[in-house]
From Swiss-Prot:
One of its GO terms (cellular component) is cytoplasm. This is Elongation factor G. GO terms for molecular function: GTP binding; GTPase activity; translation elongation factor activity. Catalyzes the GTP-dependent ribosomal translocation step during translation elongation. During this step, the ribosome changes from the pre-translocational (PRE) to the post-translocational (POST) state as the newly formed A-site-bound peptidyl-tRNA and P-site-bound deacylated tRNA move to the P and E sites, respectively. Catalyzes the coordinated movement of the two tRNA molecules, the mRNA and conformational changes in the ribosome. One of its GO terms (biological process) is ribosome disassembly. The gene is fusA. It comes from Clostridium kluyveri (strain ATCC 8527 / DSM 555 / NBRC 12016 / NCIMB 10680 / K1).
Length: 688
């Protein structure tokens, strides 16, 4: 089977934006106009084709990146519709890694919003070329020119309008195409009847101004155009398109378009712009990887005749076929029914079937070729970020990095029978989502789930109930405190019991002192005051007793013990008696050694725009945080600090409201530190 579309006619794009800017509606319209759907799905009616999880249809937001394939004027377009909510940033990150271009959707009345900044930064990291579509031009307060200014001011990009609107708010009825220098007026509700007319008289000056701006912007990128422009020659449409394309692919300019997806205006010209200006797989540099044998860097050009290289960028569970591995093919051909080598894990896997996805509908195909996006059925060991390749020409592509979870809660099934079911379900969900983690707390025995925010974990619990039929109780997160000592003391432990027949006798003296890290035990017994066989039980007894300290019953850490004296009884002494004596000695010693409570300190980095810095620093200080330093980063500041974990619960929500959603933070465990006296008293009071 040959290639249906040549590689230069391929476009792999993502649609990204702030929540509620109209991404999913825009994608629905693209599918309608390219003939993929015969009925338009409305998000607010819960019918959108791309929002296929029950939670998405209920909440009207996109949680997972739905992938779909469509055709337009002889071009093949793969589209990924990504979520705009900050808790689902991982989905955006995954998509950008495998896309060649992106359409950023703005709300015409809001311009650049917080999550727009976040996804823009992510796209910058991957060098993804972009164009901007200003949506909702029909809504009250719509302002196209304000949007262009926010792009320039807040994202520091070279935003160049290639269209301007005809009218706005309820009067919005079409666009001026600055490339063709003509107007498009929409005549019907479905947007399929358009009239290409002369630019209205009252817009001629405005159109001339922005067309000149466009020509000047592209002439700076192309010497031939510069010469023609300076000599006053008229540029052809082809020359302008070619120059804009060059500027977009090199990330030097960002074309700005406008429309109203809901009112079916401006969508087809936007699809034209995707075809005209977005790169094909041949326009972007070959994917880089490492040879697993030699460790040398190698690259794989987009070509069917090259050895196979592909990246699994998302794992999803399909109710009918099981595990789906969404994959981008960078080079070579992947065939159904063959084996593929997972070079990340060093394992061979069999491809049962290959499918192209249309949201959650599958179309089976025999092969996927360079540039394709598709899903594989049958891979057992492959996880997000794994490389799939030809075993004889192995390569490991650069994997994806995901942020650590920032919020944790305890969860338990409502019934005993649900325990095993919940374990299986959680491991499946963790396989799908690299930012969702689950573990069992060794101290409380509780199952702890961790994720990117409250909404993220809500959706996880919701999916447990809907997809896996596991009803759960969700608790509040708890902090794992520890205890330690501050001075060296000596203490005795003596266990004597006479109750007819055999008695019990164990007796020891220990010296307990603070230590830098962990626990150590030294046997300093001389002259056999305690026989050798009882030394190990004494060590064991101390270790067991240290699991519940004397301050508030939390585990004791960072101390050392020297066993230096004691006594025994020929008949009554036993291992158990010495174990009990040792635990008594530990309790006596710890209570005299100035014991204190320790709390986990988190290394917290907050990235915020300058104007919110004072507010955020004040908030960190109020949480008993210590500011370690600040670094400037692309129009923002990174505040580095240490903050107690107990003070960080609910921080994501607070930061979001204090910075209008423009602040982001990361949090990792760093070390344990002494709890202030007043807080210690409060915690011990609660424990009692």
């Amino acid at each position: 089977m040959g290639r249906e579309y040549p590689l230069e006619k391929f476009r792999n794009i993502g649609i990204m934006a702030h929540i509620d800017a109209g991404k999913t509606t825009t994608t629905e319209r693209i599918l309608f106009y390219t003939g993929r759907t015969h009925k338009i799905g409305e998000v607010h009616e819960g019918q959108a084709t791309m929002d296929w999880m029950a939670q998405e249809q209920e909440r009207g937001i996109t949680i997972t990146s739905a992938a779909t394939f469509c055709k337009w004027k002889g071009y093949a377009i793969n589209i990924i519709d990504t979520p705009g909510h900050v808790d689902f940033t991982v989905e955006v990150e995954r998509s950008l890694r495998v896309l060649d271009g992106a359409v950023t959707v703005l709300d015409a009345k809001s311009g650049v919003e917080p999550q727009t900044e976040t996804v823009w930064r992510q796209a910058d990291n991957y060098g993804v070329p972009r164009l901007v579509y200003v949506n909702k031009m029909d809504s009250t307060g719509a302002d196209f020119y304000m949007c262009v200014n926010t792009l320039r001011d807040r994202l520091h990009c070279n935003a160049i309008p290639i269209q301007i609107p005809i009218g706005s708010e309820s009067e919005f009825k079409g666009i001026v195409n600055l490339v063709k220098n003509e107007a498009i007026i929409y005549e019907d509700d479905l947007g399929t009847v358009m009239d290409e007319v002369e630019i209205p008289g009252d817009l001629k000056d405005e159109a001339e101004k922005y067309r000149t701006e466009l020509i000047e912007a592209i002439s700076e990128l192309d010497e031939d155009i510069m010469m023609k422009y300076l000599e006053g020659e008229e540029l052809t449409e082809e020359e302008i398109i070619s120059a804009i394309r060059k500027g977009v692919i090199s990330n030097k300019i960002v074309p700005v378009l406008c429309g109203s997806s809901y009112k079916n205006k401006g969508v087809q010209p936007m699809i034209d712009a995707v075809v005209d200006f977005m790169p094909s797989p041949l326009d972007i540099p070959p994917i880089k990887g490492t040879d697993p044998e030699t460790g040398e860097e190698t690259d794989r050009p987009a070509d069917d005749n090259q050895p196979l290289s592909a990246l699994a960028f998302k794992i999803a569970t399909d109710p009918f076929v099981g595990k789906l591995a969404f994959t981008r093919i960078y080079s070579g051909i992947m065939k159904s029914g063959t084996y593929v080598y997972n070079s990340t894990k060093g394992k061979k896997e069999r491809i049962a079937r290959l499918v192209k996805m249309h949201s959650n509908r599958r179309e089976e195909v025999d092969e996927l070729r360079a540039g394709d996006l598709g899903a594989i059925v049958g891979l057992k060991d492959t996880t997000t970020g794994n490389t799939l390749c030809d075993e004889q020409n192995a390569v490991v592509l650069e994997s994806m990095e995901f942020p650590e979870p920032v919020i944790h809660v305890a969860i338990e099934p409502k019934t005993k029978a649900g325990q095993e079911k919940m374990g299986i379900a959680l491991s499946k969900l963790a396989e799908e989502d690299p930012t969702f983690k689950t573990h069992t707390d060794q101290e409380t025995g509780q199952t702890i789930i961790s994720g990117m925010g409250e909404l993220h974990l809500e959706i996880i619990v919701d999916r447990l109930q809907r997809e896996f039929k596991v009803e759960c109780n969700v608790g509040k997160p708890q902090v794992a405190y520890k205890e330690t000592i501050r001075k060296t003391v000596k203490a005795e432990g003596k266990f004597v019991r006479q109750s007819g027949g055999h008695g019990q006798y164990g007796h020891c003296w220990i010296e307990m002192s603070p230590s830098e890290e962990g626990y150590s035990f030294e046997n300093a017994i001389v002259g056999g005051t305690i026989p050798k066989e009882y030394i190990s039980p004494i060590d064991e007894g101390i270790k067991q007793a240290s699991e519940t300290g004397t301050v508030a019953g939390y585990p004791a850490i960072n101390f050392k013990v020297k066993l230096y004296d004691g006594s025994y009884h020929d008949v009554d002494s036993s291992e158990m008696a010495f174990k009990i004596a040792a635990s008594m000695a530990f309790k006596n010693a710890m209570s005299k050694a100035d014991p204190v409570l320790l709390e986990p300190m988190m290394r917290v980095e907050v990235t915020v725009p300058e104007e919110y810095m004072g507010d955020v620093i004040g908030d960190i200080n109020s949480r008993r945080g210590r500011i370690e330093g600040m670094d400037p980063r692309a129009g923002a500041q990174v505040i580095r600090s240490f903050v107690p974990l107990s003070e960080m619960f609910g921080y994501a929500t607070v930061l979001r409201s204090r910075t209008q959603g423009r602040g982001v933070y990361s949090m990792t465990f760093d070390h344990y530190e002494e709890v202030p006296k007043s807080i210690q008293e409060k915690i011990t009071g609660e424990k009692k």
